[in-house]
């Protein structure tokens, strides 16, 4: 791993000495510059000499109590005695001391002190007062971690970071709080935390070392970094942060892109509150596309037609909304069905079957109707199919009737075939034929069952990766005004969704 990891503290928490030592060594090989050793995870009395024998970088000694999110099971006196042993052992450069005990343990030689406060059950109303008191303690770094109850709680942590009077690391736990784990670096945090092994469940919402390093490039984040993100619910599965951050790095744009989980019905409040950061632009996914169109102050023709937006860009007087799925669908079809220098895409007299009636289906239906195609919509809920078909002068089909008529182009806008249900297809193989164009918007995996069967039957195929990269590229251009690095964006996405995922990003 060649990326700069100096702004990541790698957290290691294992029960067995052997595994602790092994993970410390491996973290060093992967480039870790600072490791927090969660001694409260060690099942037996820790043998510090054994654990520290091959340490590759500075270490933080942490022994967390259950009320602070830890696993320490013995007495408090024993915990404080062990902390003192760590401090005088010569093996730790840092020690983490909770605010209520920091004044009881004196500074020793050059060992630096993190004075910390954790509340993983709630967001304290007096957090600012707690922070002010902590700043009066003998701390080299003040650390605040509290449970986010809403996306707006990230902003309170950011405000604390903005007003910090000494080095501070303040972020929220849980998936609602993930943005602050990354954005604290913009506001002066000396480092953020990441798990060596995410599956170990060291702390709620704690990302992995590889994830932070590969996706967010923390070494590039500074006070001038612009902020973008994707908003949706759920959002943890999104590959948009990987793709957009890779594009920013490729084009040397000083920006970072983070995921925001926002529940249905709360987008307007979220957009208003995050004006304080500010977030310069958003990708918008389920369930907020219609709400995004309504929240925008200005919009382009694609949003007017589809009444849905997948992109919001901050302007001086509010948000501008666009639907980049619309041009991306046409661009993917044009690349597949036309030749360079030849006539433009002509869909007149073409019969198109669209499977689904959600956001992407709406963009496809309106784009192809305007391009001259005859559009049929098949959906499990016939009422939704009828509503969309009426908008594009098309025909609605019950899901069971989707094989009724032959077509020139079929676009799957349903999740059928998406991981983990990779052995499913929305169409019978017998429906597919040579000369047909089969466009599957599912991109995990890229080669879905539908795509495989279409190739076998001699049909022309367009994959969901093509669509994803084109719509993300159009968003990148709206965000930055620059031409998107589509090749690089496609490369990192395909690597991420491949059966064997590599972690050696260059």
Q: Where are the language model's segments positioned?
A:
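Active-site beta->alpha loop and helix N-cap motifs at the rims of alpha/beta catalytic domains
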Residues: 5-125, 146
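NAD(P)-binding Rossmann-fold cofactor-contacting core
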Residues: 35, 371-392
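Glycine/small-residue-rich loop that forms an oxyanion/phosphate-binding "nest" at active or ligand-binding sites
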Residues: 59-104, 291-341, 345-347
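Catalytic alpha/beta core domains of metabolic enzymes, predominantly
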Residues: 94, 100-226
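Glycine-rich adenosine-cofactor-binding loop
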Residues: 172, 227-235, 321-326, 333, ...
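Phosphate/diphosphate ligand-binding glycine-rich loop within oxidoreductases
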Residues: 225-339
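Rossmann-like adenosine-cofactor binding region
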Residues: 390-461
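Rossmann-fold NAD(P)-binding glycine/threonine-rich loop
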Residues: 436-486, 490-492
